[in-house]
A protein has these predicted regions:
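Extended, alpha-helix-rich binding/interface surfaces that flank or overlap catalytic cores
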Residues: 55
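Acidic, divalent-metal-coordinating active-site segment for phosphoryl/phosphodiester hydrolysis
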Residues: 47-48
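N-terminal organellar transit peptides
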Residues: 1-37, 44, 59-61, 71-204
Length: 204
């Protein structure tokens, strides 16, 4: 356990994952009394964004992105399942779809409530509600990249003052092959020409 007076710096580089795990991590971070800063050097989608919302400050690379947190039921977005109820009479919808729609409605309500809970003590209730609606109810596709500008327009506290040490840290972790498409972090030189290494005994 981190001491209550010790700040937490967390680097997020993830396509997301289980809502349960993300909510547990986010809840623990939100309860931490000292400052919590999340660093996003490239992307933190879905559950990664949910965790980021628990931070006091989000630091993103200028080209990094967050993503919507709308729940997915298997391969289907929960919000899209609910659209079926709006577009077809109940008599034309099979029982399995109706059951999935019930689960989808509950899932969206639960995730939206989590987002509001994470944000409410740092902004007004109305703004927290707005952000939760935008992120959790299927306004965008689940893989929509939310840029720094859009994150700020939503009302999130986002900085682009990424410490160089974060990039160096990312370069130390090899990326393992993944079955599902993702983003591989490949560290590149941060200057046009690499620094010359001086050879001992050489004037150059």
């Amino acid at each position: 356990m981190t001491d209550r007076d010790v700040p937490i710096d967390l680097v997020l580089h993830t396509p997301g994952g289980l809502v349960l795990a993300a909510e547990q991590i986010a809840s623990a971070l939100r309860k931490h009394p000292a400052k919590v800063t999340v660093f996003v050097p490239h992307y933190a989608m879905s559950g990664g964004t949910l965790i980021a919302l628990a931070a006091d400050e989000i630091v993103m690379d200028e080209n990094a992105v967050l993503g919507p947190v709308d729940p997915q039921l298997g391969q289907q977005p929960a919000a899209s399942i609910l659209k079926v109820l709006e577009r077809k009479p109940i008599s034309e919808i099979d029982d399995e779809t109706l059951i999935m729609a019930d689960i989808a409605e509950k899932a969206i309500r639960q995730v939206k409530a989590t987002v509001i809970e994470l944000l409410a003590d740092r902004m007004g209730a109305e703004q927290a509600e707005h952000i939760a609606t935008m992120l959790a109810t299927g306004v965008w596709t689940h893989d929509y990249p939310i840029s720094v500008r859009e994150a700020r327009e939503l009302g999130l506290t986002v900085s682009t003052d990424m410490p160089p040490l974060i990039y160096q840290l990312m370069g130390l972790y090899p990326q393992t092959a993944q079955r599902r498409p993702s983003v591989e972090y490949i560290p590149l030189p941060r200057s046009r020409e690499p620094e010359r290494r001086q050879v001992r005994g050489s004037p150059w």
